[in-house]
Amino acid sequence: MNKIIYLTLLLSCFSSFAQITGKITDTNKKPLSFVSVYLDKSITGTTSNDSGNYELTIKKTGEYIIVFQFLGYKTVKKNISVKSFPYTLNVSLEDEEIRLDEFSIKTKENPANMIIRNAIDNKNNNTDKFKEYTSNFYSRGLFKVKNAPEKILGRSLGDLGGGLDTTRTGIIYLSETVSEITFQKRPRRFKEKILASKVSGSDNGISFNRAQEVNFDFYNNAVLIAENNLVSPIADEAFSFYTFKLEGSFYDKNAKLISKVKVTPKQVGGRVFSGYIYIVEDDWAIYGIDLFTNGKQVGIPIINELRFKQNYNYSAINNALIKISQTIDFKFGLFGFNVNGRFSAGYSNYNFKPNFTKQTFTKEVLAFTEGATKKDTDFWNQLRPVPLTKEELKDYKTKDSIKMVRESKPYLDSINKIQNKVNFLSPILGYTYQNSFKKWSLSFDGLIEDFSFNTVQGFHSSLGVSYFKRQNDKGKWWSAGLDVAYGLSDKKARPTFYYSRKWNNISKPRFYLSGGITTAQFNGRNPIKKLDNLIRSLTRRLNYIKIYEKEFVRIGYSEEIRNGVYFSSSLEYANRKPLFNTTNYSFARQSRNDPYTSNNPLEPDNFTSSVFTEHKIATLNVGATFIFGQNYLSYPDRKFNVSESKLPSLNVNYRKTFGADNSEFNADLITASLKQDVKAGNYGEFFYHFRGGMFLKNKNIAFMDNLQVKGNQMFVVTDDNRRNNFGLLEYYRFYTNNRYTEAHFEHNFNGYLLRKIPLINKLNFHLVTGIKGLFMWDKKPYYEYSIGMDNIGFGKWRVLRVDYVKSNFNGVKIDGFLFGLTF
């Protein structure tokens, strides 16, 4: 073992000096970043950093030909004789001479169209040349801010991890990742194993630099960016979205003719790119990418610009052009907080004949090797293919020092001392006392948190206290709390308590126990928000919410028992009591508005009797959710599930009510739901949701135990789950103790249709259409049809949606407009 360690150290020391180093500039002595540097006849090597410096590691002294390649500049080959290390080689690159040859000028057809058409026709042939491979991947992420504000919306930003200087300028995020990636074209699969990961100023070392997240393939018809599909310049339907112009051509190091084609969108604001694509003549493969887009086009308005650059190199092994480097530069800003960033990536050590087995690709698409986030500085100095700039090196050193200080007990205590100060708003807004070093906190819920109004309790709120203890950094914690709600009109206090525990972040097993006295909506799916009911009651005398009281104790447990299979269960014993209106208060005059209705959901004019009688009952729920095809990321001590499945998710639940005072209330119910978001490429996104239920025996059960749907009687919809709700259906009109099915379909075109209409396309609105249906065994079918506009707003503020909805029930048709916020 000692010999192995010694040999490893010896090789590491040798390799640290086996380097060719230097600086790359243009003819004006300006540093060139991300220039590809490699040995002739090889595919990959290294790249230069933002200062133009590079380090190329070779195994021994001797004669070498070093290639310097950068899009827009002439490729340079340097013959050198290396007799000792380190060897210094500085290089100056000249601008590429782009020229139009005579044939291109004389031809009647737009030569760029011919080039793009050939590139489209040869996509499959070119990508089949690297349909399977493994490679090494290195990435670096960098966020920089200039003149950052001290506060946003009244909240202090602090020093953002210690990266800001006195002008509040500096690096706020710096990370590096080294990994092995495995790729297969058919069926399309991708796998990554993290060998080393580092984040400046962080202990866990977990970065955002996933290879799959930046695997932007312009051979595909659609390039997925932030869950939005942008049309590739060589997509099958590219000519419907772009015009092309041949800027000129040049010869590469292999005497291949490279055409530089300008890409211009036909419609402004669509899911498109602008810039240049470089195509190799005869092969019709991509030689390089220099394309940009903006936040409006990718659906993230705060992004000002997003630029992609990709460099390719020829591989003689498979006679193909292979991506060897990529940069993604971006700018975004909000509330005066402006950030410039770059994610750079390099690919090396390609193997185009891997030996894949059935075990190669699983649902685990990312994993960390042991100790990947704990590598020390010496390790990174040996492994890092692209040298750090002076600014980056300083950031690592500064934040590592700051991190040690900020994890110490004196520092954490001093921060808590400031955070734990009580002010005059604490009773209203809430207050938390923290002990960060011992990892616990004590919180007080302010009066405003649960403040609301209904005609049973009147104005009501609650006071609560809770304790939270984090037991380790692997997701183990426990929490307990006590809450007392009080209504000013019914003058009744309702105390509740809870205890909850979680053991880890892998399967996320969670246990909870709760009990006390509370109020609940008759529809257990809670279709009415407290805030909505407060506003409508006080301004229009529309008291939609109907509630009952229950004294209860509940115990529950949930866990992901295997990947994509989530188990949940609960057992409750409750005494349910009817409640009645105790107040007629409203800001709205009764003479100008309809009077309040009773708390009886079926008889709005019955103020003296309820829809049910007081009773005791036990309720058992056992359910499972199946997310088919779920991929996941295995981070150290935690598992992240990826919601990118092309398959639907299924939820099945069994509910048994038993032990009731009235045996008719005892019943067995099975419910199931199936839903999916279907990405339709450039045509938008399609959503469907089916939900149904069936009682095993038809009985005269308590009203709140009936199958019910989520209706809506508000013209302003604040429910972010609107796709699963009906838009014009009265809250308590449809219920059953037998069986029912509901279906929801919605298609958001994401601008696909509207961007084809002149002037309208400048608004960047999204057309949305939908249809919903409800089918209950004892009622006629109910239907809703809708058409609307999403993404309404201006600039970076696009949070409004408007729908026109029309319903049809037994020949009776109702219509109306719904306004909603889509944060």
Question: Which residue ranges define each predicted feature?
Answer:
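Short loop/turn motifs that connect adjacent beta-strands in outer-membrane beta-barrel proteins
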Residues: T127-F130, A255, N423-L425, L429-L442, ...
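C-terminal outer-membrane beta-barrel translocator/porin domains of Gram-negative envelope proteins
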Residues: R510-L531, I535-Y548, S609-S610, V642, ...
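Residues that define the transmembrane beta-barrel architecture of outer-membrane proteins
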Residues: L306, Q457-S461, K491-P495, E549-V553, ...
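Structural motif
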Residues: Q19-L32
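Transmembrane beta-strand segments that form the barrel wall of outer-membrane beta-barrel proteins
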Residues: V263, L291-G295, W440-F453, K469, ...
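A short, solvent-exposed loop/turn motif at the edges and junctions
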Residues: L39-K41, E63, V67-K77
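Structured extracytoplasmic
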Residues: E97-I98, S104-I258, T264-V272, F335-S452, ...
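Short, acidic Ser/Thr/Gly-rich low-complexity loop/linker segments typical of extracellular
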Residues: S42-N53
